[in-house]
């Protein structure tokens, strides 16, 4: 995941934006940090989904076909 310092900076810039004191340079920095955060989040979420197996109450594997294909293509 993203470093704590970067997440703290995202939050700091967000507060400045709400207060109306965000400069143009800080806006560029905020956009860059947000994109980096979203990329990191998506990467981790994809890994979580790929490693999840869904079992119904009868004990049958009902993991969606698309997830099974992602696993197969990964290896």
Curated annotation (Swiss-Prot):
SUPFAM superfamilies attached to this UniProt entry: YnzC-like (SSF158221)
Q: Which UniProt keywords apply?
A: Cytoplasm
Instruction: Give the Pfam families listed for this entry.
Output: DUF896 (PF05979)
Provide the residue span(s) of the region labelled Disordered.
56-75
Please verify whether the record's keywords include Cytoplasm.
Answer: yes
Q: What is this protein called?
A: UPF0291 protein LMOf2365_1322
Q: What family is reported?
A: Belongs to the UPF0291 family.
The record's InterPro entries line, in alphabetical order, gives:
DUF896 (IPR009242)
HAMAP family per UniProt: UPF0291 (MF_01103)
